[in-house]
């Protein structure tokens, strides 16, 4: 007797191409697809995979977090590579000099990085400077920093659950339904 093999769950769930219609993003995908194929570097494969990702999976990273990553003594003179957005952080008083390659940098973050004597690269410039990812550090923002993530997890009433409930209001009058429904 043979075994009936169920192929129900066989497909690999991952993006194989970019979903966005942004022509500039598609050009970058073309470039990094070529680099991933022709170079033997894992770096290009990772960048390509991250270019495919949705906006939710490409979270922004603040200048302060970037500075904290690049301040380490082993990372001096390296290029910080962010497949996403670099945002400003007013809480950070002084920004160290650093080289950043990112998909997008906000106006204020750009001004502050350049004022500190730093440099901002685009991904096509990065491909010319470091085609195999030598002297680079891949960094990304926190994916679970979104407010929506607080609602995920075991049900809000369950024991040891810290999940945030979906409620319209905290007011006791509106939230509680009428008790006299069966009269």
Curated annotation (Swiss-Prot):
InterPro entries given in the database record: Ribosomal_eL18, Ribosomal_eL18/eL18-A/B/_CS, Ribosomal_uL15/eL18, Ribosomal_uL15/eL18_sf
PROSITE patterns: RIBOSOMAL_L18E
GO biological process, one term: translation
One GO cellular component term: cytosolic large ribosomal subunit
Key words, A-Z: Cytoplasm, Ribonucleoprotein, Ribosomal protein
Locations listed in the record: Cytoplasm
Record SUPFAM superfamilies: Ribosomal proteins L15p and L18e
Family statement drawn from the similarity comment of this UniProt entry: Belongs to the eukaryotic ribosomal protein eL18 family.
Protein name: Large ribosomal subunit protein eL18
Organism: Bombyx mori
